[in-house]
């Protein structure tokens, strides 16, 4: 086989392999409504922080479990309340922790907008000492959203 034919065959083989690998990647499941809401809160929180010259917060797996469980608990009980923060401090090895909670907002952007209109919630979002964030969002049986936003700083 001439050299040009071998190169063409090799290139076609490589393109076929790339196509086979690319197909499954485009067929991945889309984000759940909870994940979309959480991502919106996360991103909109960082938009506000940048707007006020604060560093962007990074996600935390440890905090994430607490935020998600609390949002689910609030939705299941159909009431909004703060969770105990002491266990989070210890479990996630933090020097400080804070929380914003909300319910009834149709999306993450609306929740962050409301928090920014409340001095205490805004102070949490813009606190220069926080470096970590996690968000949990869950709907009750009537479709009403409950969200927990947990902030932290490593010890």
Model-derived features: positions:
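Functional surface patches built around histidine and acidic residues
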Residues: 2-14, 21-155
